[in-house]
Curated annotation (Swiss-Prot):
Family: Belongs to the EMC2 family.
Sorted UniProt keywords: Endoplasmic reticulum, Membrane, Repeat, TPR repeat
Protein name per the record: ER membrane protein complex subunit 2
PROSITE patterns: TPR_REGION
Entry GO terms, CC: EMC complex; endoplasmic reticulum membrane; extrinsic component of endoplasmic reticulum membrane
Organism: Dictyostelium discoideum (Social amoeba)
Job description of the protein: Part of the endoplasmic reticulum membrane protein complex (EMC) that enables the energy-independent insertion into endoplasmic reticulum membranes of newly synthesized membrane proteins. Preferentially accommodates proteins with transmembrane domains that are weakly hydrophobic or contain destabilizing features such as charged and aromatic residues. Involved in the cotranslational insertion of multi-pass membrane proteins in which stop-transfer membrane-anchor sequences become ER membrane spanning helices.
Topology of this chain in the membrane: Peripheral membrane protein
Subunit and partners: Component of the ER membrane protein complex (EMC).
Subcellular location: Endoplasmic reticulum membrane
GO process annotations (BP): protein insertion into ER membrane by stop-transfer membrane-anchor sequence; tail-anchored membrane protein insertion into ER membrane
Length: 322
């Protein structure tokens, strides 16, 4: 369940400011700036593993005595996780011993870190055993449940992952990433109706994020039928309304609303294939989508991709059907 999914524009600006400050420090190590950067990342629940492992490791090994006691150990945990993300299994062992000497081997926070280290070494059975023992004492421990889901997913045991994720969402009902993860599991099983239920929970909690309207439209399209195709068009169109293409000329990269344009074309084409009498507004929308798709592709893509898009438009053309 990605923690970067909910990164806001203000968070992004703040992170860039911190990173630029660290880079501009040159050869000197500004431990205060690094401390503040890691503190911001913890508070925002954002993982920047390369940054944290590179600078945080030096912070906790050479400047640990300058950190407040609680923050120092919080930072150690943060650095351990970042190092594991980056494939470093040596430094986490040293830092783990420091945690264990402070809190004891039976501490829940120490057990969590131990399980993460085991998991990163592919000792999954041992890691699951620790997470299970934690949950027996603390049934609502979020990290243990999330790691169980991740392990079961990695093993291809989606039914078990769904079971744990359902239990997790009974406690943490507003976790958007968890609902998105659960919807993807159900889509893997072609359970589109159940996936839509999960995505409804996402839309209720994030009604202005255009990406989630695209995600909701996709299972609707997969279900098929005139009603679902019509609904899919509406959700794809609303995604465009929330992520307006009006300033496309100012972009130096392909716009992010392309999936919505593709979705509109496929949904309206499928309606036509079903013999549905298209409305005038749908015909105009189809024409607009085709024209914009071709314009965008010509601006940002090579000739090979342009030819592919032209072929796609020709194969889904409803205006010159024989």
């Amino acid at each position: 369940m990605s923690e970067m999914l909910m990164l806001t524009s203000s968070d992004s600006i703040e992170i860039n400011r911190y990173e630029e400050g660290i880079r501009n420090s040159g050869r000197s190590f500004n431990w205060v700036l690094v401390r503040d950067t890691l503190r911001f990342l913890r508070k925002s629940k954002i993982r920047k593993s390369n940054l944290v492992s590179k600078y945080g490791l030096k912070l906790v090994t050479q400047y640990f005595n300058k950190l407040e006691d609680q923050e120092g150990y919080d930072t150690i945990e943060q650095v351990i996780v970042a190092c594991l993300d980056c494939g470093d299994h040596t430094n986490p062992k040293k830092l783990f011993e420091q945690l264990k000497s402070k809190f004891g081997k039976d501490s829940v926070r120490v057990q969590r870190i131990h399980a993460l280290c085991l998991e990163s070494n592919n000792q999954l059975a041992e890691a699951l055993q620790i997470f299970e023992s934690i949950l027996k004492k603390y049934p609502s421990d979020a990290l243990s449940m999330k790691r169980q889901v991740a392990i079961f997913k990695g093993q291809g045991n989606l039914s078990k992952a769904i079971q744990v994720l359902n239990a997790y969402l009974q406690i943490y009902m507003c976790d958007l990433e968890a609902w998105l993860e659960l919807s993807s599991f159900h889509i893997s099983y072609l359970s589109y109706s159940t996936a839509l239920y999960c995505l409804e929970e996402v839309l209720l909690n994030a009604p202005i994020n255009f990406v989630f309207y695209i995600k909701y439209a996709e299972p609707l399209y997969c279900l098929g039928g005139n009603e679902n195709y019509n609904s899919a068009v509406q959700y794809y169109t609303h995604a465009l309304e929330l992520n307006s293409p009006t300033e496309m000329d100012k972009l130096d990269h392909p716009p992010t609303f392309l999936p919505a344009i593709y979705g509109i074309i496929m949904s309206i084409y499928s309606l036509c294939e079903e013999g549905y009498q298209l409305k005038e507004s749908q015909l105009k929308l189809m024409e607009w989508a085709q024209n914009n798709l071709l314009t965008i592709t010509k601006k940002y893509s090579s000739n090979d991709k342009i030819n592919l898009v032209k072929h796609f438009i020709d194969s889904t053309d409803i205006f010159n059907k024989e």
